[in-house]
Design a protein with these regions (language model features):
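Peripheral, non-AAA+ core regions of ATP-driven protein-machinery
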Residues: 1-218, 222, 228, 331, ...
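Hydrophobic residues in beta-strands of the RecA-like P-loop NTPase core, especially within AAA+ ATPase
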Residues: 105, 158, 284, 304-308
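Walker B catalytic acidic pair
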Residues: 300, 306-307, 318
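Walker A/P-loop
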Residues: 219-260
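Conserved inter-motif catalytic segment of the P-loop NTP-binding fold
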Residues: 245-279, 286-287, 434-444, 471, ...
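Basic, amphipathic alpha-helical bundle interface domains used for macromolecular binding and assembly
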Residues: 40-45, 60, 67-77, 290, ...
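Conserved alpha-helical scaffold flanking the Walker A/P-loop in AAA+ ATPase domains
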Residues: 208, 265, 270, 280-303, ...
Length: 514
């Protein structure tokens, strides 16, 4: 007796179809699972056996062979528990084979209840694209899977395998889950307000420029100057996620197993702040199942690295590929996977090991060589990929008491959204399909977009030769200047835009490189 059901697996960021075949034949009672299963899939036989008996069904006392096709692709995780149980029931004659356009996902508990699984959204998207009309998933995954619903596919939530069997038999139909309307606007309310930050006008301006153009920022200052406060408030002035960005971000969080139960799409821009002891694998991702790392979990959001020089050199060098390409490739013996990693880097560091080099009132206890060694932990190639560098001085007493209120996140957001609207109109032209903001311009696009006045061009030439800028630094200065001009509503880059952009860049090269 033979039966086949449809399910799905994960390969990197995308799902792929899997046929779960069950064959029951004569011979000694045994269960064999083939088709490159990992240990979690091999263990599913015991879960299915116990769940099937606890649900009141009969376990066939014959030889059972399960094949997961295609057989040349590794199958991972407990997602095949539910289709495996249904395949055994169908092959043993206890259940009519489900329609070919029906698919199943879910982990089984020993009592037959269904537990949520990771990666449901990419698998559901593949199911919808592959012509599946009915997708049965654990109830906790239903809201997420429903985001893949089109005009054809319906998502059916189930708390137990018995509910799925009864629905297939027509005894007790399951109502489909409908997708929740996408509304990212309320995500801003979850982020602290810039009005809480006292003083630091230069750093606040840098954060507005960063948000308006998607630029990377380095904040340098003594402890207590507000570096972390500024970084944590950046998502509150960024534009809302588009639905496309929300789907991509949700896929990453779903694969990583970090989606809350019952949640649909991620609506807030991610903010990730790994500890400085994080390894290169924690940042890049990896493991036996190619889990996304912090670089990918920060996709479409902010990656905040506090105490930047305290990270290992190996961990910091991992950042170079995603900062340049917007993606990161994880390679292991079992294969490789590429994840999107288009994040904004906000890094913070003290000026020296003790934190008080150059402080107006506190004495620094570090020797010049110790200061040099501390700062040299951040490599030149990484610094070259950071657009804005700001030195932050201690906040004065008068700025804490009696000063005029700082601009709120809502006020700063208006400036950012106005500049982003200019960029959206500019990059709607053919040839800019992959560009959403100024920071994503390629070298060739920079030449076409960043037109300057003659005086600004002369200034850039002199700065290029005097500061010894690299070609990459030259392009990044122009991108920042383009953002500053957009914030001011200027069509051409003038001297003011270029001088402000150079101010951030020159400070980085002169003060941090020895």
């Amino acid at each position: 007796m033979y039966a086949v059901l449809k399910s799905f697996g994960l390969k990197g960021l995308n799902g792929f179809p899997v046929e779960v075949e069950a064959d029951i034949s004569g011979g000694m009672p045994a269960l064999s699972i083939v088709g490159l299963p990992d240990s979690a899939v091999r263990e599913s036989g015991d879960r299915v056996h116990a769940a099937l008996k606890n649900l009141g069904f009969k376990w066939p006392d014959r030889r059972i062979t399960i094949n997961l096709a295609p057989a040349d692709v590794r199958k991972t995780g407990p997602v095949y528990d539910l289709p495996l149980l249904l395949a055994v029931l169908a092959a043993s004659g206890q259940l009519e084979p489900p329609p070919k356009d029906t698919a199943f996902l879910g982990e089984l508990a020993l009592d037959g209840s269904l537990r949520p699984v990771s990666g449901v959204l990419p698998m559901a998207l593949e199911a919808a694209a592959g012509g599946v009309r009915a997708l049965y998933v654990p109830a906790e995954n239903a809201a997420e899977a429903a985001e893949a619903c089109g005009s054809e596919m319906q998502v059916y939530p189930a708390a137990t395998a018995r509910q799925v069997v009864d629905a297939l038999r027509g005894i007790q139909p399951i109502l489909p889950t409908m997708p929740v309307p996408f509304d990212p606007a309320d995500a801003w309310n979850q982020v602290p307000d810039f009005a809480d930050v006292c003083g630091q006008p230069l750093a606040r301006r840098a954060m507005v420029i960063a948000a308006a153009g998607g630029h990377n920022v380095l904040l340098v200052g003594a402890p207590g100057t507000g570096k972390s406060m500024l970084a944590r408030r950046l998502p509150g002035i960024l534009p809302p996620l588009t639905r496309e960005e929300a789907v991509e971000t949700t896929k990453i969080y779903s694969i990583a197993g970090q989606m809350p139960a019952g949640r649909g799409l991620v609506t807030a821009r991610p903010f990730r702040s790994p500890h400085h002891s994080a390894s290169s694998a924690a940042l890049a991702g990896g493991g036996a199942q190619f889990r996304p790392g912090e670089c990918s979990l920060a996709n479409c959001g902010v990656l905040f690295l506090d105490e930047l020089p305290e990270f290992s050199r190996e961990s910091l060098e991992v950042l170079r590929q995603p900062l340049e390409d917007g993606c990161i490739t994880v390679s292991r013996a079992a294969g490789s996977a590429t994840y999107p990693s288009r994040f904004q880097l906000v890094a913070a560091m003290n000026p020296c090991k003790c934190g008080y080099y150059g402080h107006p009132t506190r004495a620094c206890t570090c020797s010049p060589s110790a200061v040099r060694q501390y700062r040299s932990r951040v490599s030149g190639p990484l610094l070259d990929r950071i657009d804005l560098c700001v030195e932050m001085d201690p906040v004065a007493f008068d700025e804490l008491h009696g000063a005029a209120p700082s601009e709120s996140s809502a006020e700063l957001r208006k400036q950012v959204l106005a500049a982003r609207a200019i960029q959206a109109q500019r990059y709607a032209a053919p040839g800019y399909e992959d560009v959403r903001c100024n920071a994503q311009l390629t070298a060739g696009q920079v030449r076409r977009i960043c037109r300057m006045t003659p005086a600004a061009e002369q200034l850039l030439r002199a700065s290029y030769e005097t500061l010894g800028l690299s070609a990459r630094a030259h392009d990044r200065i122009l991108r920042v200047a383009r953002t500053i001009a957009d914030l001011s509503g200027k069509r051409l880059l003038d001297e003011d835009s270029l001088l402000e952009a150079l101010q951030y860049r020159a400070q980085e090269k002169v003060d941090l490189t020895f």
